[in-house]
Each structure stands twice: as structure tokens, then as C-alpha cells.
């Protein structure tokens, strides 16, 4: 397991929740003896939606809404079996999407 790398990508709408989950993952990985590269903030994706305020007339009167998707990336270098076990047991917030890729270095 020494020549492998774990890449973790996190996505959430709330950046505070995302930073808290990232901090928990980094602390867990460092506590088990693995090296951590990151967290690297990735570009925030902003989806904007424009809707008419009125259902009938007044085309010029519109309202805009936006959804921001914040992203972070972590690389765990030289993970041990204990690191993988602890990361599997980690209970993260429900609003955070976690994507994990395991690759050889």
C-alpha cells in the first residue's frame, strides 16, 4: 500500500461545512501517519437562474437566484492500512459529497 495515493474531492453548497469536513479528514490522515497534500480550493461553480417576478406581465421585472458549489481537493500520500480504516469509519456531514480515487504513484 506504500506506493499508492488517495485523491479525495469534496463538494458542498455550504463552505463552512466543507471546510469542517476537510479539516476532519486531514486530522485523521495525519494522526495515522500519512502525508497530506492540500486542501486545495478548486474553483467555485456558480449557477444563476433568472425568473420573471410576475406570472402575467412586466417582462422587465425579474429576479435572480444563484447556487454556489464549493469544491476542495486533498491528496493523501503513502497511506497505511490504518489510514484507510480510519477514513472509512469517519462520519462526515450529510451536505458534503465525497469522491475518492485510489491510484498508484
Curated annotation (Swiss-Prot):
Coiled coil: none
GO terms classed as biological process: translation
Keywords: Ribonucleoprotein, Ribosomal protein
InterPro entries: Ribosomal_uS10, Ribosomal_uS10_CS, Ribosomal_uS10_dom, Ribosomal_uS10_dom_sf
Pfam families referenced in this protein's UniProt entry, alphabetically: Ribosomal_S10
GO MF entries: structural constituent of ribosome; tRNA binding
GO cellular component, one term: ribosome
Assembly: Part of the 30S ribosomal subunit.
Function as written in the Swiss-Prot or TrEMBL entry: Involved in the binding of tRNA to the ribosomes.
Family stated for the protein in its record: Belongs to the universal ribosomal protein uS10 family.
UniProt-listed PANTHER family: 30S RIBOSOMAL PROTEIN S10 FAMILY MEMBER (PTHR11700)
Protein name: Small ribosomal subunit protein uS10
Organism encoding this protein: Bdellovibrio bacteriovorus (strain ATCC 15356 / DSM 50701 / NCIMB 9529 / HD100)
Amino acid at each position: 500500500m506504500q506506493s499508492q495515493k488517495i485523491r479525495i474531492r469534496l463538494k458542498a453548497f455550504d463552505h463552512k461545512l466543507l471546510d469542517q469536513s476537510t479539516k476532519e479528514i486531514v486530522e485523521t490522515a495525519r494522526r495515522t501517519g500519512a502525508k497530506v497534500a492540500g486542501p486545495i480550493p478548486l474553483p467555485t461553480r456558480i449557477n444563476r437562474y433568472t425568473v420573471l417576478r410576475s406570472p402575467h406581465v412586466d417582462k422587465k421585472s425579474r429576479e435572480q437566484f444563484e447556487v454556489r458549489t464549493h469544491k476542495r481537493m486533498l491528496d493523501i500520500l503513502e497511506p497505511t492500512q490504518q489510514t484507510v480504516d480510519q477514513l472509512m469509519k469517519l462520519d462526515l456531514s450529510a451536505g458534503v459529497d465525497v469522491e475518492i480515487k485510489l491510484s498508484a504513484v
